[in-house]
Every structure is written in C-alpha cells, then in structure tokens.
Amino acid sequence: MAERFRGYLPVVVDVETGGFNSATDALLEIAAVTIGMDEKGFLFPEHTYFHRVEPFEGANIEPAALEFTGIKLDHPLRMAVSEESAMTDIFRGVRKALKANGCKRAILVGHNSSFDLGFLNAAVARNDLKRNPFHPFSSFDTATLAGLAYGQTVLARACQSADIDFDGREAHSARYDTEKTAELFCGIVNRWKEMGGWRDFND
C-alpha cells in the first residue's frame, strides 16, 4: 500500500453537519473507513469507525440541515460523544492502520472531499488535537473520480453506475455514505489497475 500512493494511506471520511460552515456549524456525525490492499494489489474497505457527535458549545444548527439528514438530536438512542472523543478514537484507528501498512500519513478520501476535510480540520483546531494523521489539505475526491470513470458526480448515481447497491433511505447517514464511498473508491482504483493503469514496479 505504501508504494501505491507515495506513502499515503487512503482513509474514506464522511461527515453530517448542522450546515455548510465548518467554523460555525455543528459536526453531528463522522465516519471513517480505512482501506486495505490484498496480495494482488487490489484495494478493499477494511475497518469502519463511526460516531454520533455532540454539537460543540455555541454551534449553529440549521433546521434545514436536520431535515435533510434526518438526524434527531434528542433521540434516546443517539448516544453521541464529544468531538474530542470521536476524533481521538478515529485518529487512533487510523494511526494503527498507518503502522500496519507502512504508510507515513493518511490522505482523506471523500465525496466532495473538501467539505469533509474542512469539518475535520475545524474539529481538530477547536479541540487542539495533536498528531492529526491526515494531510492538512490534500485529498482524493470521489465526485471527480466518478465523473471521470462513470460520467456521474452524485454519489447514488455513481454507485449505481458502478453496480454498487445504494439504498436512498440510508443515505445521509455518515456511516452508510462512508462505506458506499469506500466501495466506489476501491472499485475505481481497482478498475484502473485492471486496465493496466498502474503496476507495482517491484513485482
């Protein structure tokens, strides 16, 4: 894996939020999927981390955002944790995957990845978290990759074009969207390999 992406480990991330502004709007859910590589050089989704997150103090939450995601903040089974706890757990898992794969840093993979990376970086700054394993500004965007591979930029349509089952009723859950984005990313990279677009020159 370390040689496939120049020492970077792809980690798929999706966030659900209280709006579009990472500085002022609440982070409500975050999920991350680490990516593995088999002995033939093909990628696969490896491990999922998921947390519902308590809005930080003073966070803005737009009613339209809750309506869009279907998140119910007062649901008795929501069992949300603090931003710090959620990020610390995910970072711990990512660092473990980095070590296992011989990679030096994680690179965020997301569908419209700048949005997810912006909220991740804002949570890191708010909580003064050290040892953030993610590259601070580089990312892989599956909206771009899917546009190239399938002519589709919407996640559901891209998955359908890639023959990945996608249930619209489950969409806008960070866990579901992250796992589907991980399948999409692995599928595109693996398809490129099958077409001869990448070879392991150490073979």
Swiss-Prot record:
One of its GO terms (molecular function) is nucleic acid binding. The active site is at residue 172. Residues 11-185 form the Exonuclease domain. Disulfide bonds: none annotated. Mg(2+) 2 binds at residues 14, 16, 172, 177. This is Ribonuclease T. It comes from Pseudomonas putida (strain ATCC 47054 / DSM 6125 / CFBP 8728 / NCIMB 11950 / KT2440). Pfam families: RNase_T. Its cofactor is Mg(2+). The keyword Transmembrane helix does not apply.
